[in-house]
Amino acid sequence: MESIFNNSFATLVAYVGIVSIYLLVIPLILFYWMNNRWNVMGKFERLIVYGLVFLFFPGLILFSPFLNLRLRGDSKG
């Protein structure tokens, strides 16, 4: 019985780890990367970013109300 509990707990920890990486860690890294490189990306890098946005869309949706990628305009009045 004890091995079943340990096995279930290990499975639960693995699932929580994978879900947190998929929904939290990689989308935040992707937001940071897009925010810093948006205006200087080449076409292949942009293609990779579009693929990653498609792949990690659920995590990006979680952070979209709090982060935005608006372009910085001139600070002239």
Swiss-Prot record:
Its EC number is 7.1.1.-. It is a multi-pass membrane protein. It is an enzyme of class 7 (translocase). It holds the Pfam family NdhL. Keywords: Membrane, NAD, NADP, Plastoquinone, Quinone, Thylakoid, Translocase, Transmembrane, Transmembrane helix, Transport. The chain crosses the membrane at residues 12-32, 47-67. It is found in: Cellular thylakoid membrane. It comes from the Bacteria. It catalyses: a plastoquinone + NADH + (n+1) H(+)(in) = a plastoquinol + NAD(+) + n H(+)(out); a plastoquinone + NADPH + (n+1) H(+)(in) = a plastoquinol + NADP(+) + n H(+)(out). GO terms for molecular function: oxidoreductase activity, acting on NAD(P)H, quinone or similar compound as acceptor; quinone binding. GO terms for cellular component: plasma membrane-derived thylakoid membrane. NDH-1 shuttles electrons from an unknown electron donor, via FMN and iron-sulfur (Fe-S) centers, to quinones in the respiratory and/or the photosynthetic chain. The immediate electron acceptor for the enzyme in this species is believed to be plastoquinone. Couples the redox reaction to proton translocation, and thus conserves the redox energy in a proton gradient. Cyanobacterial NDH-1 also plays a role in inorganic carbon-concentration. NDH-1 can be composed of about 15 different subunits; different subcomplexes with different compositions have been identified which probably have different functions. Belongs to the complex I NdhL subunit family. This is NAD(P)H-quinone oxidoreductase subunit L. The lineage of its organism: Bacteria, Bacillati, Cyanobacteriota, Cyanophyceae, Synechococcales. The gene is ndhL.
